[in-house]
Amino acid sequence: MQTYLVGGAVRDYLLGLPVKDRDWVVVGADAQTMLAQGFQPVGKDFPVFLHPETHEEYTLARTERKTAKGYVGFSFHADKDVTLEQDLMRRDLTINAMAQDADGKIIDPFGGQRDLAAGILRHVSPAFAEDPVRILRTARFAARYRFEIAEETIKLMRQMVENGEADALVAERVWQEFAKGLMEKNPRKMIEVLRECGALKVLLPEVNALFGVPQRADYHPEIDSGIHTLMTLQRAADMGLSLPERYAALLHDLGKAKTPSDILPRHHGHDLAGVEPVREVNQRLRAPKHCAELAELVCRWHIIFHQVGQLKSQTILNVLKKTDAFRRPERFQTALNVCIADTQGRLNREHTPYPQRAHWFALLEAANQADSGKIAAECRAQGKAHLIAEQIDRARLAQIAPLQKTFRAAQDKTEKH
């Protein structure tokens, strides 16, 4: 019975990165051997055991065979006769198909160290094509390390998409990998890889449709709506924004793919036009509620948020109410963070100031100065409970109006200079 450290732990060790999770493979043992050593079985589908002291996962060396379409259509064989190389051969990429023995020696039968040094993601064997999740994983690793995909691997990924393997992916697995990819350092790269292999058209056709759609060059020097979306997503990542914010950044301009061709490159009403596509993506991916809600809110309101200096006080109050800013100020703040990424996610506009964010906060704070509890109590005491909402609105408007007047005056002065 020999144990080897495998997979991501070896890869990150060789890259000089912190090793977060350690996975082990056991060669020359079976389930009875593991139980006799005090290991606890935990795997339902695979022979996985927990170490009695460290509680790290130890898996019996195994081989796999494709039995049906999709990522669950596999049977496996785990026995004492399965070698380490056979176990490593079933893995996705060469950089993940290395092992380290107890003496620290690296076992690398498929050239993982070479590909690490070259910054290349390369599949281990044709068996890569048997698991469509590997398309997403490869795109995610590209986003993490900014590695390039080997030509033969991207070709195989295209073939998988053409053969319908990506269609067999279930929403939960797509979201799981997709969410991880969005939180990598370079999520733009993930989307680029998915587009290059054709998977984006299958998994996120609404995003794929943005590429080739022109925008006004004076607002968007990058021209292409798809490129702007990638830049906005990457800006959100560079800002260190959360998963819901990055997801919203990716979907914020879906309405531009719906713009009638006769009005291009203008996109009047794309904020409203994008709401239904965002809902469709949310449903297909089964996005968590907090991600889905923020994506829809940003899509619907980002243009209004940008144009705060042009709004009347009554419109501002209506926006604060419709976006639920009074009850959910934290979500309101995250939406405005995405608006910064949208503004700065343009060619040569990475450092464009966004004073609208601070102004919206100031407007919300000012509106909150109206004592709604006191107003409600006074209305009830006067037998005018039916006027509570109206009176609260009046009090809030009285707070908003002078602040908005000052902001617009300052904006006009800046534009004149």
Curated annotation (Swiss-Prot):
Q: Which reaction does it catalyse?
A: a tRNA precursor + 2 CTP + ATP = a tRNA with a 3' CCA end + 3 diphosphate; a tRNA with a 3' CCA end + 2 CTP + ATP = a tRNA with a 3' CCACCA end + 3 diphosphate
Q: Tell me the GO molecular function terms.
A: ATP binding; CCA tRNA nucleotidyltransferase activity; cyclic-nucleotide phosphodiesterase activity; magnesium ion binding; phosphatase activity; tRNA binding
| Segments forming domain HD | 225-326
Keyword set for this entry?
A: ATP-binding, Hydrolase, Magnesium, Metal-binding, Multifunctional enzyme, Nickel, Nucleotide-binding, Nucleotidyltransferase, RNA repair, RNA-binding, Transferase, tRNA processing
Query: How many cofactor units bind, and how?
Result: Magnesium is required for nucleotidyltransferase activity.
What PROSITE patterns would the database entry show?
Answer: HD
E.C. number:
2.7.7.72, 3.1.3.-, 3.1.4.-
Cofactors required: Mg(2+); Ni(2+)
Please indicate if the UniProt record lists Transferase as a keyword.
yes
InterPro entries attached to this UniProt entry: CCA_bact, HD/PDEase_dom, HD_domain, NT_sf, PolA_pol_head_dom, PolyA_RNA-bd, tRNA_CCA-adding_enzyme
The UniProt record gives the binding positions of Mg(2+) as 21, 23
Amino acids binding ATP: 8, 11, 91, 137, 140
Biological process (GO) annotations?
Answer: RNA repair; tRNA 3'-terminal CCA addition
Q: Which PANTHER family match?
A: MULTIFUNCTIONAL CCA PROTEIN (PTHR47545:SF1)
Record's family? Belongs to the tRNA nucleotidyltransferase/poly(A) polymerase family. Bacterial CCA-adding enzyme type 1 subfamily.
Output the HAMAP family linked to this UniProt entry: CCA_bact_type1, CCA_bact_type2
Subunit architecture: Monomer. Can also form homodimers and oligomers.
Function (record text): Catalyzes the addition and repair of the essential 3'-terminal CCA sequence in tRNAs without using a nucleic acid template. Adds these three nucleotides in the order of C, C, and A to the tRNA nucleotide-73, using CTP and ATP as substrates and producing inorganic pyrophosphate. tRNA 3'-terminal CCA addition is required both for tRNA processing and repair. Also involved in tRNA surveillance by mediating tandem CCA addition to generate a CCACCA at the 3' terminus of unstable tRNAs. While stable tRNAs receive only 3'-terminal CCA, unstable tRNAs are marked with CCACCA and rapidly degraded.
This protein is called: Multifunctional CCA protein
